[in-house]
């Protein structure tokens, strides 16, 4: 029990290809510094939203993370249209509020325990939502009627989300990426997941979770080159 209320963790804007980097040529008399040689601009929309045979958006593609304060593979600037987490200037959302006992547990963690909360250290699957929040690498999505497969370019992580309307299990077997059910709300695919392995962490700062964790993801593809993923963590 680490949370008092539902808190949206991130509204992450993800692009389908690396940000366009425009290189300015240097003349013989140019005195520009190295960093001034590059102008980073948002990727253009790229065309209309591709769709499956049933008319729903097709999320298939190789997606680079580009939001929530994180650039593509940590090397490129963040798209200025992306919203950083808990930026009071851009969003009225408050940072997560922990119960006193949860906050005390996090503060009592040793340096070793905090390091082990990082999936890059413990080498276990990142889990959800950490696979989005702790992953600076690409995600390849294969979308077909009835199935959404996500292949992550880190530690051989993968995830299968059935989109055939099957309900959540009443007594779910805990998995690193949980047990999911889906529904469409217009052109947005809503994925609700429960039954997570408690060895995963929401963030690599000791933010642990209980077996009551529920994660809701909302996938929207407004154009060819962009995928918006909104994640809400609910931990009573």
Model-derived features with residue positions:
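PEST-like low-complexity, intrinsically disordered acidic/proline/serine-rich tracts
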Residues: 2, 6-236
């Amino acid at each position: 029990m680490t949370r008092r209320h539902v808190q949206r963790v991130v509204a992450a804007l993800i692009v389908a290809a690396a940000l366009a980097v425009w290189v300015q040529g240097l003349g013989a008399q140019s005195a520009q510094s190295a960093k001034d040689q590059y102008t980073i601009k948002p990727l253009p929309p790229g065309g209309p939203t591709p769709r499956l045979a049933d008319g729903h958006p097709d999320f298939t593609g190789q997606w680079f993370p580009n939001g929530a304060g994180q650039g593509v593979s940590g090397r490129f600037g963040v798209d200025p249209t992306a919203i950083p987490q808990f930026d009071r200037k851009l969003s009225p959302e408050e940072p997560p509020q922990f119960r006193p006992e949860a906050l005390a547990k996090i503060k009592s963690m040793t340096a070793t325990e905090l390091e082990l909360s990082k999936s890059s250290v413990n080498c276990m699957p990142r889990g959800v939502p950490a696979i989005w929040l702790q992953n600076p690498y690409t995600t390849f999505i294969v979308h077909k009627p009835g199935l959404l497969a996500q292949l992550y370019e880190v530690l051989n992580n993968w995830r299968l989300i059935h989109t055939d309307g099957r309900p959540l299990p009443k007594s779910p077997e805990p998995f690193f990426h949980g047990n999911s059910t889906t529904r469409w709300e217009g052109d947005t695919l809503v994925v609700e997941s429960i039954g997570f392995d408690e060895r995963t962490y929401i963030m690599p700062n000791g933010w642990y979770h209980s077996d009551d964790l529920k994660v809701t993801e909302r996938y929207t593809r407004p154009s060819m080159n962009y995928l918006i993923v909104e994640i809400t963590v609910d931990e009573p």
